[in-house]
């Protein structure tokens, strides 16, 4: 893919219970003992009204998350993931240990987090919209052309925002006319913040022009290419690179 295509880049309703198992009430802590025994509870299945799967392939999943003020979810889980706050807000996270934490996420916040199990409520006054990139891959290394790392080759265009757990988040910024030398990315997920038109040239010299629209999201395999912004507007994106082997 291009933009890695290269510019190629939390929740949820309780699952059904049987018999007299503990019920979840307005206070998520009441189900603490039951929740501790739950296995994986996919947020997108538990709360499809809050979690929308945009793309799911190669052990990488992009999920668009939207919580309006007052929206809440029951217990659910996430594997290791990266998060980008497209529209900031305030949310309270409830852990299975009974602890709760209020988190004010400003627009543009970027994090990489371990897999976790929680419930969430929007306790702010604005809609919270985040992009989640979940990684369903084991820890380890994968083969890619690290010698031509985009950050080393074009550090003025690719900035590291977070790098841990084999997940690296890059902030990408190409002004009109700017271009990069040939560089590489491992498998990745892309979220376009501000769109433009990009020209991608692969190792063989083949050129591909892509209209990168605001809000575009995609997952792409490792690749090597150069990029040029041939549009008239600045191109900004978040690229989540995954340096882990597939299962």
Can you name each region flagged by the protein language model?
Residues 8-11:
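C-terminal motif of bacterial Sec signal peptides marking the signal peptidase cleavage site
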Residues 13-15:
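Bacterial signal peptide processing site
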Residues 48-72, 80-83, 151-179, 187-190, ...:
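A short glycine-rich, His/Asp/Glu-containing loop-to-beta-strand
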Residues 55-56, 97-115, 206-222:
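Short acidic-glycine-tyrosine-enriched beta hairpin
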Residues 70-73, 110-121, 179-180, 216-228:
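Histidine-centered metal-chelating micro-motifs
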Residues 78-97, 185-204:
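Glycine- and acidic-residue-biased ligand/ion/polar-headgroup-sensing regions
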Residues 88, 116-137, 195, 222-246:
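Ligand-binding loop in jelly-roll beta-barrel domains
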Residues 129-165:
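Surface-exposed beta-loop interaction hotspot
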């Amino acid at each position: 893919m291009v933009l890695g295509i290269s510019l190629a880049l939390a929740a949820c309703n309780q699952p059904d219970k049987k018999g007299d198992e503990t019920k979840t009430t307005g206070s998520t802590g009441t189900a603490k003992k039951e929740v501790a025994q739950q296995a994986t509870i996919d947020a997108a299945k538990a709360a499809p009204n809050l979690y929308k799967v945009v793309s799911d392939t190669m052990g990488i999943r992009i999920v668009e998350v939207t919580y309006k003020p007052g929206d809440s979810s029951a217990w659910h889980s996430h594997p290791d993931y990266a998060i980008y706050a497209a529209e900031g807000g305030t949310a309270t996270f409830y852990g299975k240990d009974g602890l709760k934490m209020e988190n004010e996420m400003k627009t543009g916040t970027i994090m990489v987090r371990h897999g976790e199990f929680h419930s969430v409520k929007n306790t702010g006054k604005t809609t919270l919209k985040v992009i989640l990139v979940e990684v369903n891959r084991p820890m380890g290394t994968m083969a890619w052309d690290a010698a031509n790392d985009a950050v080393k080759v074009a550090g003025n265009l690719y900035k590291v925002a977070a790098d841990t757990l084999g997940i690296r988040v890059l902030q990408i910024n190409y002004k009109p006319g700017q271009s990069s030398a040939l560089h590489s990315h491992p498998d990745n997920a892309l979220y376009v913040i501000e769109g433009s038109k990009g020209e991608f040239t692969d190792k063989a010299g083949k050129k591909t022009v892509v209209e990168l629209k605001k809000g575009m999201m995609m997952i792409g395999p490792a690749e090597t290419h150069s990029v040029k912004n041939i549009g008239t507007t600045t191109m900004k994106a978040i690229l989540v690179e995954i340096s882990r082997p597939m299962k």
